[in-house]
């Protein structure tokens, strides 16, 4: 190969890997700690010692492969089809007048209109988060499903759609945003629950990625919903850091991935702890979420079956 690409023979070339897997390593993943890469979607990575996984096959997740994340470990992968994209979708709905009408204003010039639009759009999610955090947590508020891009895990079904119920004339933008935020956190809990149901303990959560770094509101809510602490990794580019750790092992600087993580890891700069009172309410809300999800899935699956039969007989 060295002759083919004209490199000197002493150059060591490592094989590639998935970005989220390298991100989990860069984020200092530990056995049975769920590394949650949170951006537009999520990629949830968990590793377990190979000898402890004999005879275990987790149903309804994205993948389970020996050595796929760390040598000597079984890598398990799950994820949510829409996470940050859910918040961005709602922001874009609210921003429609700014994107489509502001440039036609006769009060301000075009350059000012563009600057004002960009400034206002940039403030939407931070201000929604601030106002939503002031709302009391209760059992009867608006409820949403986070399936705006289908469901990846557990039990992938890309036909599923998002839903929101409990709307009234008193429902405003912060309340709708709060419902969407809850839905994404409930989606995270459904993944944790699946691992636990399949005999895989989840001892903690490691948060990496854009949403983990930028949204204390979402991270605190997730800690409350999951009922466990969430550690946020200090380094912003954990995928690149993980790639560097693997390169250090390939080049012989460190003998194992674990030793590379210990030497090159940047640690954690924030930790969110669950509020027990809110957790109790969220458990009841989670039951409502699951019931709504079952209803939505039954309606969509029913329509899909009718369409499928019609297509076959046509």
Predicted feature descriptions by range:
Residues 5-9, 25, 188, 192, ...:
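Structural motif corresponding to the C-terminal cap of alpha-helices
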Residues 36:
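Conserved active-site beta-strand element of glycosyltransferases/polysaccharide synthases
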Residues 2-6, 17-33:
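Conserved phosphate-binding catalytic cores of ATP/NTP-utilizing and phosphoryl-transfer enzymes
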Residues 22-26, 42-46, 144:
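Short beta-strand scaffold segments in enzyme catalytic cores
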Residues 4-10, 228-231:
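Structural signature of cysteine-dependent C-C bond-forming condensing enzymes
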Residues 9, 32, 203:
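Short coil/turn segments at beta-strand junctions that form active-site/ligand-binding loops
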Residues 14-15, 46-314:
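Glycine/Thr-rich phosphate-binding loops that ligate phosphate moieties of nucleotide
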């Amino acid at each position: 190969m060295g002759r083919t690409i004209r490199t000197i023979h002493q150059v060591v070339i490592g094989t590639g890997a998935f970005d989220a897997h390298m991100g989990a390593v860069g984020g200092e993943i530990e056995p049975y700690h769920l590394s949650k890469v949170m951006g537009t979607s999520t990629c949830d990575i968990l590793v377990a010692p190979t000898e402890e996984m004999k005879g275990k096959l987790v149903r309804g997740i994205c993948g389970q492969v020996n050595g796929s994340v760390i040598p000597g470990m079984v890598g398990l992968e799950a994820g949510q089809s829409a996470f940050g994209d859910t918040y961005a979708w709602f922001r874009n709905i609210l921003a429609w007048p700014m994107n489509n009408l502001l440039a036609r204003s006769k009060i301000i010039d075009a350059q000012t209109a563009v600057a004002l639009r960009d400034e206002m759009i940039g403030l939407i999610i931070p201000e929604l988060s601030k106002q939503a955090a002031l709302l009391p947590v209760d059992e009867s508020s608006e409820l949403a499903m986070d399936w705006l891009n289908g469901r990846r895990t557990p039990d992938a079904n890309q036909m599923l759609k998002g839903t929101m119920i409990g709307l009234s004339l008193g429902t405003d933008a912060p309340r709708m945003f709060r419902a969407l935020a809850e839905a994404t956190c409930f989606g995270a809990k459904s993944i944790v629950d699946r691992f636990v149901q399949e005999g895989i303990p989840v001892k903690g959560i490691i948060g990496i990625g854009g949403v983990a770094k930028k949204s204390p509101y979402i991270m605190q809510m997730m800690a409350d919903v999951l009922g466990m602490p969430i550690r946020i990794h200090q380094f912003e580019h954990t995928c690149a850091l993980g790639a560097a750790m693997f390169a250090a092992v390939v080049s012989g600087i460190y003998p194992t991935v674990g030793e590379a993580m210990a030497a090159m890891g940047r640690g954690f700069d924030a930790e969110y702890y669950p509020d027990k009172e809110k957790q109790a309410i969220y458990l009841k809300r989670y039951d409502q979420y699951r019931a709504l999800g079952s209803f939505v899935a039954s309606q969509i699956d029913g329509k899909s079956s009718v369409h499928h039969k019609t297509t076959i007989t046509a």
